[in-house]
Amino acid sequence: MQLKDYEFGFADATKEYVRKPEIFKDAFCDTRNFVEKLISGYDFLLIGRKGVGKSAFSAKIQSLSLESNSKIVAQVLNLSDFEFSTFAKTGIDNNVSGTQKYKSSWDFIMLLTIYKILFNKLEMIESDSVNDILDLLDKAGFSLENEYKSDIVRLTKVKLGAGIMHFDAEFEKKYNTAPSNYLERVSVITEKMILGLKDTYLNERQVIVIIDGLDDILRYKKNRAEIITSTALLKYQ
């Protein structure tokens, strides 16, 4: 064989999955059945040194979601381009430290990501539960068509109290109570989103949100570790 007869893949699994899916499919090896554990088991955190192939499992789950008749719907949230400096402004209180400081904001961002999947990928436009939440999000200034960077910017504005008078008025009209600060506003929306999910029938489909790039982020600025550790508290059933 000559060199031209060889077909080379990529060192980066995500890039190979996108550009050379046939090579990725043949080359991927999972002798310890990690993919099945991540999809169906209780394991949710994949730890390893940089370069050992953690992102390959993310790419594999994404590839499975694209197979015909797949019940998996996957969405990746890559932390390498996450707006940490902006997100840091959404901490609930300067006097609060540790994981609780950003948990409410993370709850909101992750649940909003799930609702984007329901609306954009599963097209659940006829669900009353989903539509009620979409209306609530719209009044708060969040669009399901925006990238998550725009959501973080909007969340910061909610923290500052910008453009929320209409939301507060509509919320009070519908639920006979009005939130008075950022934590209350985010918490009530989050609570409604969770209740909406409980009333939503997925027809055995499984929604998976993959957070990638954690190891890269923790090398940098001090507040990022505090922000990231808040994700360990997230749990939705």
Predicted regions and their residues:
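Conserved catalytic network of the ASCE P-loop NTPase/AAA+ motor domain
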Residues: 37-38, 199-203, 237
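Generic beta-sheet signal
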Residues: 42-46, 205-211
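Walker B catalytic acidic pair
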Residues: 212-216
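Short, flexible/disordered intra-domain loops and linkers
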Residues: 221-227
